[in-house]
């Protein structure tokens, strides 16, 4: 990682925030988890140790053996379960200072899109029988905190763009979020949802109402972590509050949006939170166009 200014920036930022639990998105997966363990070691060298990790195999780049994107060929990145140049590209990494409980860990990444309740899938049968719902991965687990289990649900949903009038990616994104909402119905409390839904409640492409429905889930609270940088970079044509934006995308479209969320269950006490987006960008490189969202919670 020594030659990557972006990775060095990410390590410094994480070490300065000092999270107990961290969900990293777009982290390439390998079968032996060498990259994940190297990142752990590099983070420890920065002064912040996160001893425990979970890295489910992502759907990105996983071959389906059929022509999904309709280009007349099989085996391209558009024919994978989710777009990817290789299996494991842009995966999901969960790090923690508290041990994960394997008995409560469940990977929902292999559930087929056509089989979820009230599916929006319109894929033909030959695609529907293989197409998974999760764009990257969807994982639930728990940690023990002060002798009490805290459940976690994390996922990275499809971008609701890069398609056509058929809105396939938009419909898949909506169903991923709706499926997560159904999992929350069954999830024991207390819990925390950590997700890149790729969907803003008000602005940008996608089924925005689905995001508003998730935020209004009766078991969730939305602390609305904010930043001065988001406010200072406001897109005047947007409806949503700029201070809540979490990603710095090109203007004017899509512009800055709120797509990254930490949503605790209602029985957790929210102490503090924010989005790491300084009002004035420093010359040093950003870790990512997605800003780090953080939330401090305590047991009631």
Tell me the role of every PLM-derived stretch:
Residues 7-8, 127-142, 175-185:
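A Trp-anchored, charged/polar loop motif used as the substrate-binding/catalytic surface
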Residues 64-86, 90, 96, 101-126:
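Extracellular polysaccharide-degrading/modifying enzymes targeting complex plant/algal/animal polysaccharides
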Residues 8, 12-16, 37, 41, ...:
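Solvent-exposed, polar/charged alpha-helical surfaces in well-ordered, non-transmembrane soluble domains
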Residues 99-111, 171-192, 197-300:
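Metal-dependent phosphoester-hydrolase catalytic domains
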Residues 92, 97-102, 125, 132-156, ...:
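Beta-strand-turn-beta hairpins that frame and shape the catalytic cleft
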Residues 1-7, 122-126, 161-172:
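Acidic/histidine-rich helix-loop elements
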Residues 27-31, 58-62, 100-101, 157-161, ...:
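Solvent-exposed loop/turn segments at secondary-structure junctions
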Residues 1-92, 148-150, 281, 298-300:
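N-terminal, active-site-proximal structural segment of metallo-dependent hydrolase catalytic domains
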